[in-house]
């Protein structure tokens, strides 16, 4: 039976403790007082290579705490690191496991991902592995919807481009839109989620999405409430 707050067991030695960490880049320590680097899993090499790898098998690591899959996407967005293929395969295989994790923990990781320097990387990883089907199913659904008014293969690609453009509007800390702006970035990825539900085909092959903005606003409020965002954030994002 999965716990909503998994308890990770630790080893009897420093090395044993490190092997139970989430990723090798976090599985290093300095032994005092000599400041000797303890790196049983090759974390320093992975740090230099920009690779996210688990100290033990990815399946075992994610079974210990399924939130680590969200953390992989967040670190990819924060650090610009690549995810090792075994890790990505395990994320795909276990994509539904975050359902047993508390909503608050999932939301916290999603927030960290979105305010990272490269949120597009993290979102693409969530969608590619199927994790978005649990966390942001409305985003994943956009892959199946084509909007002929935009120069993208689907609304999903258009949405990620809008996210990039929204980040370009952010300013320094003393400007009108201090970066990173969580509300702006959430609004960017949610702005077209009403299109799949409102898509209609007209004679001649024309596609319309009449009322998608109003439908999308309702869907946004529902999703953000489910993720337990605060009321002000929900209000601001759905208004945008």
Please identify what each model-predicted range represents.
Residues 1-240:
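Catalytic cores of the polymerase beta-like nucleotidyltransferase superfamily
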């Amino acid at each position: 039976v999965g716990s909503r707050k998994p308890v990770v067991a630790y080893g009897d030695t420093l090395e044993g403790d490190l092997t139970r960490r989430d990723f090798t880049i976090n599985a290093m320590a300095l032994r005092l007082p000599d400041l000797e680097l303890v790196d049983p899993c090759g974390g320093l090499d992975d740090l230099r290579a920009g690779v996210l790898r688990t100290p033990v098998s990815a399946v075992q690591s994610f079974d210990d705490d399924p939130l680590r899959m969200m953390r992989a996407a967040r670190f990819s967005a924060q650090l610009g690191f690549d995810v090792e293929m075994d890790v990505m395969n395990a994320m795909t295989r276990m994509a539904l496991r975050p359902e047993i994790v508390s909503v608050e923990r999932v939301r916290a990781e999603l927030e960290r991902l979105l305010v990272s320097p490269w949120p597009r990387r993290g979102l693409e990883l969530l969608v590619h592995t199927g994790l978005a089907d649990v966390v942001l199913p409305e985003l994943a659904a956009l892959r199946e919807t084509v909007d002929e008014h935009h120069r993208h293969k689907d609304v999903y690609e258009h949405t990620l481009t809008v996210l990039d453009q929204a980040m370009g509007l952010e300013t320094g800390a003393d400007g009108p839109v201090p970066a990173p702006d969580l509300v702006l970035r959430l609004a960017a990825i949610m702005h077209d989620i009403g299109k799949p539900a409102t898509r209609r085909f007209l004679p001649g092959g024309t596609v319309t999405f009449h009322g998608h903005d109003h439908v999308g606003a309702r869907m946004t409020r529902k999703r953000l409430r489910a993720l337990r965002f605060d009321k002000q954030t929900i209000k601001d994002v759905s208004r945008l």
